[in-house]
Amino acid sequence: MYRFAPSPTGDMHIGNLRAAIFNYICARQKNMDFILRIEDTDKSRNIKGKEEEIKEILNLFGISWQHYYIQSENLKFHRQMALKLVSEKKAFACFCTEEELEAKKELAKKQGKAYRYDGTCEKLADIDVLECEKSFVIRLKKPTHTMKFTDFIKGELSFEPENIDSFVIMRTDKTPTYNFACAVDDMLENVTCIIRGEDHVSNTPKQEHIRASLGYDKAMTYAHLPIILNEEGVKMSKREAHSSVKWLLESGILPSAITNYLIMLGNKTPYEIFTLEEAIKWFDISKVSKAPARFDLKKLLQINREHIKMIKDDELNKILDLNKDLAQLAKFYTQEASTIKELKEKMRAIFNTKDFGEFETECKILKELLKDIELFENYEDFKNKLLNKSSLKGKKFFMPLRIILTGNIHGPELSDLYPYIKNFIHELARI
């Protein structure tokens, strides 16, 4: 069982989407169920509407799920599991205040040591715990042995007990911490493989320790994906616009192109241009590079152009939403436009009212002739017929003709454009 477990706290990051795509591909390859779990236990950071937005984005990318969970609805199970650990003396109530802990952290810092919980409350007698009226958290006792796990990308990793420490699993308000909720849910939902960003590597031994302490002995496999760097080679921040999946979509980049690019990023793929369904046939998670991958927007735009060309004409017409059969014309313009947004602008320039500028007289002459001109199969015949009828020459012929047909004074060769614009010439002459 594979899962994607986002939090509804902001726009979906491309790193999160990459994890969703990889989990989905692996689930499909192994004919296993795929889980979508919304991790909403940090109520103060949740943003209204983001849960639905996550589902909408996944649907756009062709990612479906067989099971859907809301983490906060599992709260009773989190509390039951915490109580079990306390009753078995594997976890304990900690009454240390934030101020006390902060003072100990400062002391460790001055001594040049890494802070570790000193076990102040670990050996409190039961009667002392019962009689203490202070608020408390619950800590899981640190493991007694080295925690090891194998990662499909990073190989075997190990963590010593002192580096895991006795960590908090339940807060003072009786809600679970991220690691505890995540570990318990993965256990309850029978997740068998976790693919996520490498920023979670330090969480993995804690989650392994939680499940082991609860007596869960089913093996879990992992793949921690390297971080995505920006074009300057620095870790991509959520504040950077193109780190947001929503921004990429609103900019007119197709979901299929984003998927293609994210699968390629830091990976060895047999082809440069492919679909999600094609990738499912050959994708290998172990081939993903250990090294961070640099995001290249220009490369993504190049891939997007190729995916626009691959779209069926009726589907592209629907996306362009301009009430005309413009698919072939739009595909021709991918030599200049890289996104759906740019293509719409090109199409609007062609079919909207034009500014003729200094060529107003010439444009009027040509428009009258174009209203019922014979539409020859090849451009040379069309051009010669129009030249003869208009008596215009050189710049005073070609520039106004370009404005009428494209709405711009610059653009593709008219001879190249003609086969795609031919059927619209009579209409354009009447605008």
Swiss-Prot record:
It is found in: Cytoplasm. PROSITE patterns: AA_TRNA_LIGASE_I. Its EC number is 6.1.1.17. GO terms for biological process: glutamyl-tRNA aminoacylation. GO terms for molecular function: ATP binding; glutamate-tRNA ligase activity; tRNA binding. ATP binds at K238. Its main location: cytoplasm. GO terms for cellular component: cytosol. It is an enzyme of class 6 (ligase). Keywords: Aminoacyl-tRNA synthetase, ATP-binding, Cytoplasm, Ligase, Nucleotide-binding, Protein biosynthesis. A motif ('KMSKS' region) lies at residues 235-239. Belongs to the class-I aminoacyl-tRNA synthetase family. Glutamate--tRNA ligase type 1 subfamily. Monomer. Catalyzes the attachment of glutamate to tRNA(Glu) in a two-step reaction: glutamate is first activated by ATP to form Glu-AMP and then transferred to the acceptor end of tRNA(Glu). This is Glutamate--tRNA ligase 2. It comes from Campylobacter jejuni subsp. doylei (strain ATCC BAA-1458 / RM4099 / 269.97).
